[in-house]
Amino acid sequence: METTDWSALGFDYCKTDWNVRYSYTDGKWSPMEVTQDEYIKMHMSASCLHYGIELFEGLKAFRGVDGKVRLFRVADNARRLQSSAERLCLPVPSVEMIVDACVEVVKRNERFIPPYETGASLYLRPVMFGTTVGLGVKPAKEALLIVYCSPVGAYFKGGIKPIRVAVDREQDRAAPRGTGDVKVGGNYAASLLSGEKGHELGYSNIMYLDAAEHKYIEECGAANFFGIKDGKYITPKSPSVLPSITNMSLRQLARDMGLTVEERHIPVEELATFEECGACGTAAVISPIGFVYDMQTKAEYSYGEEVGKTCLELYTRLQDIQYGRAEDKYGWCTVVL
């Protein structure tokens, strides 16, 4: 990989050497299989192809300032994968299985881990789906769990920058008591139409409100939302919001900075009172929000063209832990190499 232009990497698939697989048949998981095959042979009547019995995860490995390679909160991603599997009535792999697979993938693909100074990282994608052959709607009795990886570039080229976001009440991300709190493919498929509408109008993301009343902020694109005001870090509390591992981390770092953390309903009109706000997730860590436009009420909320002080400090503190520049006092990182 000596000739790779790491700075040119985006967030896209890049072929690596190895992936790891487990199959579930006859009531038990197979031993780990390590393969270079990028393809899957699947029956046309496999349940995942017809009934959306599919889930995935996303996490990163970072080459640190000290040369060590760290996986960030891999056990938390494993536990969230278990929750998604339970929700879809899929067989539930153990945390140990998932963590072992992630560690193996990082070790096997060491040459694809970007150098420290590039700001890039190795993205891991665990994906699991039902493979039972049939026609009717029923839980899958066979499944496949794969973990693969791809090097990805820094989300913001040239430094963290605010994004433009639009509120759209005409599309909902997830129904109340639906699957919004688990990481399943259908949630993302359902967001594509409104996302494309927003992109056509010049917005990076759509801000989704609660599906029941369309009063409260839920998610921002495929990321959690948070707002900063009066010394508080405020983020939505809702059973249809995915529990973001990045948001969990930022809440702890906010407390470390002396902020009060509130998890509660956030009326969309409260956007007018925030000093800063942002979207957070694995891909970007934090995407500061510079402008919000409400498509239905025509209200506009502006937070400036530069990243706010609190967002920048939160971003820096988390990246410092991920890249080994700061003490990992909460034990979030697993040193792999």
Residues of each region from the PLM?
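Charged, gly/pro-rich active-site loop segments
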Residues: 95-96, 105-119
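Extended, Lys/Arg-enriched charged tracts that mediate electrostatic binding to polyanionic substrates
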Residues: 115-129
